[in-house]
Amino acid sequence: MRNVTLVLSDGTKFHGKSFGYDAPVAGEVVFNTAMMGYPESLTDPSDAGQLLTMTFPLVGNYGVPPFTIEESGIPTFMESDKIYVSALIVSDYTEEHSHWNAVESLADWLKREHVPGITGIDTRELTKVLREHGVMMGKILFDDEPNNIPEADYEGVNFVDRVSTKEIIHYNEGAGKKVVLVDCGVKANIIRSLITRGVEVIRVPWNYDYTGMDYDGLFLGNGPGDPDMCNDAVEVIRKQMSMSKKPICGICMGNQLLSKAAGAKIYKLKYGHRGHNQPVRMVGTDKCYITSQNHGYAVDASTLDKDWQELFVNMNDGSNEGIRHKENPWFTSQFHPEACSGPVDTYFMFDKFVETLK
């Protein structure tokens, strides 16, 4: 393993060893508190452009499952068809993996997909730095090479445009109700969660004008980066809401886009919510759910139009976790009810949406 250094934009340095693809890289340094699920996290398009730090110390111990495609056309064990993170940062990479479904090691997978990995980092200290000072840009540099990699511009890039489908894709054709899925970087398990409930899914590009299509409901998927880069999608959502009261549901980026269409403002969280243990409360009830989350931006609920209200609130920091319209069947969650990986406490969100289609 070659010696590498993680250099944060404030000058803080962490020294470690390379266990992935040997190449320098720059991106936004973030942390994820999940104890498992690295195959899903690495292939989640929402992590595009990020240097992902896993706070759980042992990573790689169960290897990597095979990349297979289900009959429905979506990956079986991954959330997309490739790794989207720019690099993986861990405390202790486990070289000898063991799992009945593993076909290769995490290191071999990273190398095959040309994704750098760094181990031996004090991820506890790194997380404390990010928690105190906020997420920041960083570089992974090789100690025996000159620093000739440019700074990354995370907030100035439309990552949604990079990861979204470029063509219309149909799933479960011929099923009962039709749902248009706006792909901002949608995870495979969101598609799976819809088609297993007996609907046809029509996956469209993030900025596609679907208002003239024949469908029964609209679903706004997750995605990476700054939602303010996606105003084209917001305008189409507004157009749809002005034309009909067809059901609308959104997840993660979908929550932010629908909120923008409802007049709300978006702001960047200090260090985001990334992990499997985020508690949220359903507004107006005493019900609290443990959720899987992966976002760095949040909705300023105080700026919502008067016809809208909060649906969920984060119990840790009070930030918005979902909205709903007071009359029409339009609602969202900032968290991921489909999990994969993580808790499935809020899987009922898909049931609620499909029920509104009938």
Listing of model-derived features with the role each one plays in the protein:
Residues 1-207, 227, 235, 340, ...:
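RNA-binding accessory domains that recognize and position tRNA/RNA substrates
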